[in-house]
A protein has these predicted regions:
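Fe(II)/2-oxoglutarate oxygenase catalytic core
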Residues: 1-198
Length: 198
Protein backbone atom coordinates (compact mmCIF):
# COMPACT_ATOMS: atom_id res chain seq x y z
CA UNK A 1 0.00 0.00 0.00
CA UNK A 2 1.07 3.56 -0.61
CA UNK A 3 1.33 5.79 2.46
CA UNK A 4 -2.19 7.04 3.29
CA UNK A 5 -3.39 10.48 4.32
CA UNK A 6 -4.89 8.91 7.46
CA UNK A 7 -4.07 5.49 8.91
CA UNK A 8 -7.20 4.53 10.82
CA UNK A 9 -6.25 1.02 11.94
CA UNK A 10 -3.30 -1.31 11.50
CA UNK A 11 -4.74 -4.84 11.57
CA UNK A 12 -6.75 -4.97 9.45
CA UNK A 13 -5.27 -2.09 7.49
CA UNK A 14 -7.88 0.67 7.24
CA UNK A 15 -6.85 4.00 5.75
CA UNK A 16 -8.08 6.98 3.78
CA UNK A 17 -6.41 8.78 0.89
CA UNK A 18 -7.64 12.30 0.33
CA UNK A 19 -8.30 13.95 -3.05
CA UNK A 20 -7.44 10.85 -5.05
CA UNK A 21 -10.27 11.46 -7.52
CA UNK A 22 -10.95 14.94 -8.90
CA UNK A 23 -14.29 16.73 -8.66
CA UNK A 24 -14.65 16.42 -12.43
CA UNK A 25 -14.01 12.67 -12.34
CA UNK A 26 -16.50 12.20 -9.50
CA UNK A 27 -19.16 14.08 -11.47
CA UNK A 28 -18.43 12.06 -14.61
CA UNK A 29 -18.77 8.74 -12.78
CA UNK A 30 -22.08 9.86 -11.29
CA UNK A 31 -23.35 11.01 -14.69
CA UNK A 32 -22.31 7.73 -16.31
CA UNK A 33 -24.15 5.71 -13.66
CA UNK A 34 -27.34 7.76 -13.24
CA UNK A 35 -29.41 6.13 -15.97
CA UNK A 36 -28.15 2.58 -15.38
CA UNK A 37 -28.96 2.04 -11.71
CA UNK A 38 -30.68 -1.15 -10.55
CA UNK A 39 -31.90 -1.98 -7.01
CA UNK A 40 -28.98 -3.44 -5.07
CA UNK A 41 -28.88 -7.00 -3.74
CA UNK A 42 -26.72 -8.50 -1.04
CA UNK A 43 -23.85 -10.70 -2.25
CA UNK A 44 -25.19 -14.19 -2.91
CA UNK A 45 -28.86 -13.18 -2.64
CA UNK A 46 -31.36 -13.55 -5.47
CA UNK A 47 -33.77 -10.83 -4.40
CA UNK A 48 -33.81 -7.30 -3.04
CA UNK A 49 -32.99 -7.18 0.67
CA UNK A 50 -33.89 -4.81 3.49
CA UNK A 51 -30.25 -5.14 4.56
CA UNK A 52 -29.18 -2.95 1.66
CA UNK A 53 -31.21 -0.03 0.34
CA UNK A 54 -29.51 1.49 -2.70
CA UNK A 55 -29.19 1.42 -6.47
CA UNK A 56 -26.08 0.32 -8.34
CA UNK A 57 -24.45 -0.38 -11.68
CA UNK A 58 -21.16 -1.88 -12.91
CA UNK A 59 -18.48 -0.66 -15.34
CA UNK A 60 -15.74 -2.65 -17.03
CA UNK A 61 -12.36 -1.08 -16.34
CA UNK A 62 -11.90 0.03 -19.95
CA UNK A 63 -15.53 1.03 -20.61
CA UNK A 64 -14.82 4.77 -20.42
CA UNK A 65 -11.66 6.87 -20.21
CA UNK A 66 -12.52 8.27 -16.77
CA UNK A 67 -13.36 4.80 -15.44
CA UNK A 68 -10.04 3.45 -16.74
CA UNK A 69 -7.99 6.29 -15.27
CA UNK A 70 -9.64 6.08 -11.85
CA UNK A 71 -9.33 2.28 -11.70
CA UNK A 72 -5.65 2.36 -12.69
CA UNK A 73 -4.96 5.03 -10.07
CA UNK A 74 -6.58 2.93 -7.34
CA UNK A 75 -4.68 -0.20 -8.41
CA UNK A 76 -1.40 1.72 -8.13
CA UNK A 77 -2.31 2.80 -4.59
CA UNK A 78 -3.26 -0.66 -3.30
CA UNK A 79 -0.40 -2.21 -5.33
CA UNK A 80 -2.53 -4.93 -6.87
CA UNK A 81 -2.84 -5.56 -10.63
CA UNK A 82 -6.06 -4.05 -11.95
CA UNK A 83 -7.03 -7.37 -13.53
CA UNK A 84 -7.33 -8.76 -9.98
CA UNK A 85 -10.28 -6.42 -9.36
CA UNK A 86 -13.96 -6.87 -10.08
CA UNK A 87 -15.66 -4.37 -12.35
CA UNK A 88 -16.11 -0.92 -10.83
CA UNK A 89 -19.40 -0.72 -8.94
CA UNK A 90 -21.09 2.68 -8.60
CA UNK A 91 -23.82 2.97 -5.95
CA UNK A 92 -26.32 5.65 -5.01
CA UNK A 93 -28.02 5.85 -1.61
CA UNK A 94 -30.99 8.22 -1.35
CA UNK A 95 -32.44 9.49 1.95
CA UNK A 96 -33.18 6.36 3.99
CA UNK A 97 -30.53 4.41 2.09
CA UNK A 98 -28.14 2.25 4.07
CA UNK A 99 -26.17 -1.00 4.08
CA UNK A 100 -26.34 -2.89 7.37
CA UNK A 101 -23.20 -4.33 8.98
CA UNK A 102 -21.60 -6.94 6.71
CA UNK A 103 -18.36 -8.41 5.42
CA UNK A 104 -17.08 -7.95 1.87
CA UNK A 105 -15.10 -11.20 2.02
CA UNK A 106 -16.62 -14.56 1.17
CA UNK A 107 -17.37 -16.89 4.08
CA UNK A 108 -15.00 -19.88 4.02
CA UNK A 109 -17.39 -21.75 6.35
CA UNK A 110 -20.18 -21.91 3.75
CA UNK A 111 -20.40 -23.94 0.56
CA UNK A 112 -21.22 -20.81 -1.46
CA UNK A 113 -18.19 -19.03 -0.03
CA UNK A 114 -15.82 -21.92 -0.71
CA UNK A 115 -17.16 -22.35 -4.25
CA UNK A 116 -16.80 -18.64 -5.00
CA UNK A 117 -13.26 -18.55 -3.61
CA UNK A 118 -12.24 -21.59 -5.67
CA UNK A 119 -13.58 -19.95 -8.82
CA UNK A 120 -12.59 -16.30 -8.48
CA UNK A 121 -10.51 -16.05 -5.31
CA UNK A 122 -11.21 -14.27 -2.05
CA UNK A 123 -11.90 -10.53 -1.86
CA UNK A 124 -8.72 -9.34 -0.17
CA UNK A 125 -8.97 -5.55 -0.45
CA UNK A 126 -11.89 -3.12 -0.64
CA UNK A 127 -11.20 0.27 -2.26
CA UNK A 128 -14.14 2.65 -1.92
CA UNK A 129 -14.31 6.16 -3.39
CA UNK A 130 -16.68 8.78 -2.04
CA UNK A 131 -18.03 10.58 -5.11
CA UNK A 132 -19.80 13.38 -3.22
CA UNK A 133 -20.19 15.06 0.14
CA UNK A 134 -23.29 13.91 2.02
CA UNK A 135 -25.44 16.54 3.74
CA UNK A 136 -26.11 14.34 6.77
CA UNK A 137 -25.38 10.67 7.51
CA UNK A 138 -23.96 8.08 5.14
CA UNK A 139 -20.77 7.44 7.09
CA UNK A 140 -18.85 4.17 6.79
CA UNK A 141 -18.78 2.58 10.23
CA UNK A 142 -16.59 -0.25 11.51
CA UNK A 143 -18.72 -1.11 14.56
CA UNK A 144 -16.24 -3.40 16.34
CA UNK A 145 -13.49 -0.78 16.10
CA UNK A 146 -15.61 2.32 16.71
CA UNK A 147 -14.21 3.87 13.52
CA UNK A 148 -16.50 6.11 11.49
CA UNK A 149 -15.50 7.69 8.17
CA UNK A 150 -17.45 10.68 6.86
CA UNK A 151 -17.95 10.78 3.08
CA UNK A 152 -15.74 13.40 1.43
CA UNK A 153 -15.73 13.92 -2.33
CA UNK A 154 -12.68 12.35 -3.97
CA UNK A 155 -11.48 10.49 -0.86
CA UNK A 156 -10.51 6.83 -1.19
CA UNK A 157 -11.15 4.46 1.74
CA UNK A 158 -9.09 1.26 1.62
CA UNK A 159 -9.35 -1.69 3.98
CA UNK A 160 -8.25 -5.30 4.20
CA UNK A 161 -10.95 -7.94 4.39
CA UNK A 162 -8.75 -10.84 5.48
CA UNK A 163 -6.08 -11.73 8.00
CA UNK A 164 -2.49 -11.03 6.98
CA UNK A 165 -1.19 -13.41 4.28
CA UNK A 166 -4.45 -15.35 4.36
CA UNK A 167 -7.82 -15.58 2.64
CA UNK A 168 -9.57 -16.07 5.98
CA UNK A 169 -12.03 -13.35 6.95
CA UNK A 170 -10.82 -10.70 9.40
CA UNK A 171 -13.66 -10.21 11.86
CA UNK A 172 -12.73 -6.55 12.39
CA UNK A 173 -13.39 -5.85 8.69
CA UNK A 174 -17.13 -5.84 9.37
CA UNK A 175 -18.54 -2.48 8.30
CA UNK A 176 -21.76 -0.72 7.41
CA UNK A 177 -23.01 2.17 5.34
CA UNK A 178 -24.89 4.36 7.81
CA UNK A 179 -28.33 5.77 7.08
CA UNK A 180 -28.40 8.73 4.70
CA UNK A 181 -30.46 11.37 6.52
CA UNK A 182 -30.19 14.29 4.07
CA UNK A 183 -29.14 14.50 0.42
CA UNK A 184 -27.76 11.43 -1.30
CA UNK A 185 -24.57 9.42 -1.19
CA UNK A 186 -22.59 8.21 -4.22
CA UNK A 187 -19.70 5.76 -3.97
CA UNK A 188 -17.61 3.71 -6.38
CA UNK A 189 -15.95 0.47 -5.26
CA UNK A 190 -13.28 -1.90 -6.52
CA UNK A 191 -12.84 -5.26 -4.81
CA UNK A 192 -9.40 -6.80 -5.34
CA UNK A 193 -9.18 -10.60 -5.27
CA UNK A 194 -6.33 -12.99 -4.63
CA UNK A 195 -6.32 -14.09 -8.28
CA UNK A 196 -6.90 -12.55 -11.70
CA UNK A 197 -10.51 -11.84 -12.73
CA UNK A 198 -9.78 -11.75 -16.48
Amino acid sequence: MKKPSNLLYDDPFIASYEKIVTQKECSELIDLAKNQLEPSKVMGASKISEVRKSGHTWFQHDSHETVRQVCERIASIVKYPLNYAEQLQVVRYKVGGKFNAHFDSFDTFTQLGRTTISQSGQRIITALIYLNNVSLGGETLFPDLDIKVTPSEGTLLVFENCKKDSNKRHLFSKHEGCLVKEGEKWIATLWFHEKSQY
